[in-house]
Amino acid sequence: LMRKDVDTLTD
């Protein structure tokens, strides 16, 4: 995951 994705995704 990319850091921005961590904020929106939970995988």
UniProtKB/Swiss-Prot annotation:
The subunit field of the Swiss-Prot or TrEMBL record says:
Heterodidecamer composed of A and B subunits, each containing 8 globular oxygen-binding functional units. Heterogenous decameric or multidecameric structures may also be formed.
Q: Where in the cell is it found?
A: Secreted, Extracellular space
Give the cofactors, semicolon-separated.
Answer: Cu(2+)
Role summary: Hemocyanins are copper-containing oxygen carriers occurring freely dissolved in the hemolymph of many mollusks and arthropods.
Question: What is written in the cofactor note of this entry?
Answer: Binds 2 copper ions per heterodimer.
Q: Which residues form a coiled coil?
A: none
Task: Give the highest taxon in the source lineage.
Answer: Eukaryota
What family does this belong to?
Answer: Belongs to the tyrosinase family. Hemocyanin subfamily.
Q: What is this protein called?
A: Hemocyanin subunit A
Q: Does the keyword Transferase apply?
A: no
The record describes its post-translational modification as: Forms a thioether bond between 2 amino acids.
Tissue/organ expression: Hemolymph.
Cite the entry's keywords alphabetically. Answer: Copper, Metal-binding, Oxygen transport, Secreted, Thioether bond, Transport
